[in-house]
Amino acid sequence: MNGMITRREDFDLEEILPKLKAYSPTGVVMATTCKEREVLPGDGYKVALLDLGAKKNIGDSLHKRGCEVNIYPADTKAEDILAANPDGIMLSNGPGDPKECTEIIKEIK
């Protein structure tokens, strides 16, 4: 669902509405992912978090529960994540249309 915040009162809703409905941002996963691997040290389970636009709270919540959290950029190769021998792999939520992430989805599979 798209929306608009404006202070203007003099706009034509009939003119703007089709533009709002057609608006579809691209490249948002790569624009929001971390740029390099981040580690939140812990003594519990070792979790790999693939950052597809993750909110900071996701990694923090796992870390707070004792997990070692390795946060990886969205374009990280599967072999690099698996080489760290994680106990589990988590895919974060993120912005945009998943259909745009064909290479990431292929790598995950």
Where are these regions (language model features)?
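Glycine-/acidic-rich phosphate or pyrophosphate-binding loops and their flanking alpha/beta elements
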Residues: 24-49, 80-83, 104
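Serine/threonine-rich low-complexity intrinsically disordered regions
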Residues: 7, 12, 40, 77, ...
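Short coil/turn connectors at secondary-structure junctions
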Residues: 1-2, 42-45, 67, 85-86
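Phosphate-binding glycine-rich loops and adjacent basic patches that engage nucleotide phosphates
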Residues: 18-26, 41-43, 66-75
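Fold-independent oxyanion-binding glycine-rich loops
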Residues: 8-9, 35, 50-53, 74, ...
